[in-house]
Amino acid sequence: MSDIKKVVLAYSGGLDTSVILKWLQDNYDAEVVTFTADIGQGEELEPARKKALQLGIKPENIFIEDLREEFVRDFVFPMFRANTIYEGEYLLGTSIARPLIAKRQIEIARATGAQAVSHGATGKGNDQVRFELGYYALEPGIKVIAPWREWDLLSREKLLAYAEKAGIPIEMKHKQGGAPYSMDANLLHISFEGRHLEDPKAEAEADMWRWTVSPEEAPDQAEYLDIEYEHGDPVAINGKRLSPAEMLTELNRLGGKHGIGRLDLVENRYVGMKSRGCYETPGGTIMLKAHRGIESITLDREVAHLKDDLMPRYAALIYNGYWWSPERRALQVLIDHTQEKVNGWVRVKLYKGSVSVVARDSKETLFDKTIATFDDDGGAYNQADAGGFIKLNALRMRIAENARRQRG
């Protein structure tokens, strides 16, 4: 332990990471640097600075940074270029935030001369893997302190007792038993885990949802959006250009208004267990549908199918924490290359929990009306050619059937 003189802690200002801060001081006798990232969680972050100061952190060792634009531009948008979904439903809202936090922690460790980094992820979840794979990929020699795998504070009561003994300010909600759910939020989504959600037979309570109205209570009038795309990324809504963070914020607002993006999911964690979570991803749900819409007229068929084949692998890499791996980076180069001609606009309809594409157009379109028409195409397509195409593709099946008959 003596070789660790300074450690950078991913710090939220909440009970868990405040206890970790004090525990690091007590058990490692190390100078603690706190890093708090604004990635759109919607919380006031200055209280984290105040609490860190109360716990003896030097002002120059407190880092609070607005990373919302970088988060959407460099992490969310690249992921959505691949139409990424984990296990058919999950849009990876938590998974995609961890690589950015890990990256910035390592940068701060280099800048401050820290020998170690620390996080508040438990020993049961995926986040410990995501953080630490990122740390080691970006700084191979870094030391990692994961308190939940070291200490004996394995219950809420023990955490509260430690906090009280150490003089850590305790919010009233923790004294009264804590929040009903374990929640994680950023610009892409908000997640809910724990408490009665740990019983997969129990339906989520109606008052749990924060960002979306129920589809039944959504407006009776549908709303239409024209979303403009450049190189696979959304850049404007109804003619108004928006920054990446502004884009996702506005789509969240519009999607939430129409009850879009709710998900109740049992997923397979990388560490081996099944876990239930509920998610609200209104803006991401709209982006996924719209992106598929613009790709439908701008991507070559085989390129589109190749992307579909690779997507589950790409999604698993992100979910499991391999954002900074060579294979994810290689896949990203391919994905980004496919997006060069993904330009144009998509019209989507928002109505009572659903989002559907109703129109799309592009200067790069591969949709040829003269060939696709059911009317006279003026010779653009010779239907007689289809006969030879079919016979050649049927050849192997005809040979197989003839062989079967000969064998009796």
From Swiss-Prot:
Keyword Cytoplasm part of the UniProt annotation: yes
CDD domains: ASS
Binding site for L-aspartate: 122, 126-127
Reaction catalyzed: L-citrulline + L-aspartate + ATP = 2-(N(omega)-L-arginino)succinate + AMP + diphosphate + H(+)
GO cellular component: cytoplasm
InterPro entries documented for this protein: Arginosuc_syn_C (IPR048268), Arginosuc_syn_N (IPR048267), Arginosuc_synth (IPR001518), Arginosuc_synth_CS (IPR018223), Arginosuc_synth_type_1_subfam (IPR023434), AS_cat/multimer_dom_body (IPR024074), Rossmann-like_a/b/a_fold (IPR014729)
Keyword Electron transport: no
UniProt GO molecular function: argininosuccinate synthase activity; ATP binding
Domain of life: Bacteria
Enzyme class: ligase
GO biological process, one term: urea cycle
Quaternary structure note: Homotetramer.
Protein name as catalogued: Argininosuccinate synthase
Taxonomic source organism: Paraburkholderia xenovorans (strain LB400)
Gene transcribed to yield this protein: argG
